[in-house]
Amino acid sequence: LPPNVNEVIKVISKKNKEKLQVHGAVAANWLGLTTQMPMKKTYYTTGITRELEIAGTKVKFIHSSNEKLFLFHGTEVGLAIAAMHYLGKELVNEQVIQKIKSRLNEQQFEQLKNSPLPSWMKRAVISENNYA
């Protein structure tokens, strides 16, 4: 049996004491915000940029020093942050926030609202229009 790629990635992350966050394109796809998907499993990392092949699957790690990108890494709240980071302030609008809100439970959305997000994300998330 080939190893589970996601489990191997977790072991590598733990061994190297690095944080991983799913790439924003994957996060945006999970949230139903885009149909685009990277050709390789792609993660942001606090470690070095590199590519590996694990059980025939190409995995790319892209270094980022943006600590806010790793807030709640490995959680659905972290996915929402990665998706917004990927989309950028020009594309994150009320519809995007409503889609994110529909994928998170109330506690997770509160966690997102109360986290130290970049100012443009914070404004989008706490906009009064989002409480409809």
For the regions a protein language model found, what residue spans apply to each?
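Amphipathic alpha-helical interface surfaces
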Residues: V5, H23-G24, E76
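Hydrophobic alpha-helical interaction segments
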Residues: H63-A132
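Glycine-rich loops and low-complexity Gly/Arg-rich segments
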Residues: N4-V5, T45-I48, I54, E67-F70, ...
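A short, charged helix-loop
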Residues: E53-S64
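Generic structural signal for residues positioned in beta-strands
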Residues: T42-Y43, K60, L79
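Short gly/ser-rich loop at a beta-strand->alpha-helix junction or flexible surface loop bordering the NTP-binding
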Residues: S13-A55
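Short beta-edge/loop segments at beta->alpha junctions of small alpha/beta modules
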Residues: L1-I12
